[in-house]
Amino acid sequence: MVKHCIDQFCVFGNPINHTQSPYIHSLFSKQTGIVYEYSARLVPFKEFNSYVLNFFLNKGKGANITVPFKENAYVISNNLTIRAKMSRAVNTFKKLHNNKILGDNTDGIGVLHDLKRIKFIKSKFNRVLLIGAGGAARGIIFSLLSYGCSIVVLNRTITRALQLVEDFKNVGSISIFKEKFASNYSFNLIINATTINICQNSNLSTIKSLIHKDVYCYDINYSIKHKYTEFLLWCIKNGAICVSNGIGMLVSQAAHSFYLWYGILPETNSIICKLNRQFYML
């Protein structure tokens, strides 16, 4: 009797007990009919490299990487996709036929996929205010610029925002937010890519006047307890009507990891709806 090896995948992180990835991938497996195993692995902070090496030596086919290891994953990848190079972070590994490890970043394409799904982006000519200039912001800029969005970066530390503009200026239209010209700005979409508590974010008072019923507000963060993050509640309080948390991004970036591994893009809407029902009784 021939024994078939089941493809092995996992997500590396620390902490990892909160991850929804194994559940999401179990739904991808049912949807596509592709049988594979996907587990969550807690990695000690200083042992990421050895854990990854052992996983791929033991027939691992691919993996996802979450905080705080995305930059480590970027460093140890043998090959990188263009979006991983631009992001300087990797959230997806794929083992190639020559046993080399390809590093990719599906965060940006995941955000873009979800924004198109919920119609927060309806054309290629979108004016986006991006709040934050850290790793999360860097991870999504390339895909948005490549699609044709123009981006203005708002960050507490201007030097970090300036660095992002410098790094991505050849990809598309990107600039820093200038407070003295705040009243001159007009945006279709505002994206929060920072985890800073809104009470500690002095930038928000600057953009208060830019929020109204026709501006879409999107937070890449999410909570399994509350549908609306603090940022989204603040947006609603200041006049926003169309808001969304990061559940859709979570599922969509996972779908694009699956696409990298198998060449098939799972349908995401039904899975996002299922998670919303489970988390928020919707």
Curated annotation (Swiss-Prot):
GO terms for cellular component: cytosol. Belongs to the shikimate dehydrogenase family. Pathway: Metabolic intermediate biosynthesis; chorismate biosynthesis; chorismate from D-erythrose 4-phosphate and phosphoenolpyruvate: step 4/7. Homodimer. Involved in the biosynthesis of the chorismate, which leads to the biosynthesis of aromatic amino acids. Catalyzes the reversible NADPH linked reduction of 3-dehydroshikimate (DHSA) to yield shikimate (SA). InterPro entries: Aminoacid_DH-like_N_sf, NAD(P)-bd_dom_sf, Shikimate_DH, Shikimate_DH-bd_N, Shikimate_DH_fam, Shikm_DH/Glu-tRNA_Rdtase. NADP(+) binds at residues 132-136, 155-160, 224, 246. Shikimate binds at residues 19-21, 66, 91, 107. Keywords: Amino-acid biosynthesis, Aromatic amino acid biosynthesis, NADP, Oxidoreductase. CDD domains: NAD_bind_Shikimate_DH. Disulfide bonds: none annotated. The lineage of its organism: Bacteria, Pseudomonadati, Pseudomonadota, Gammaproteobacteria, Enterobacterales. It is an enzyme of class 1 (oxidoreductase). It comes from the Bacteria. SUPFAM superfamilies: Aminoacid dehydrogenase-like, N-terminal domain (SSF53223), NAD(P)-binding Rossmann-fold domains (SSF51735). This is Shikimate dehydrogenase (NADP(+)). The gene is aroE. GO terms for biological process: amino acid biosynthetic process; aromatic amino acid family biosynthetic process; chorismate biosynthetic process; shikimate metabolic process. It catalyses: shikimate + NADP(+) = 3-dehydroshikimate + NADPH + H(+). Its EC number is 1.1.1.25. The active site is at residue 70. GO terms for molecular function: NADP binding; shikimate 3-dehydrogenase (NADP+) activity. Signal peptide: none annotated.
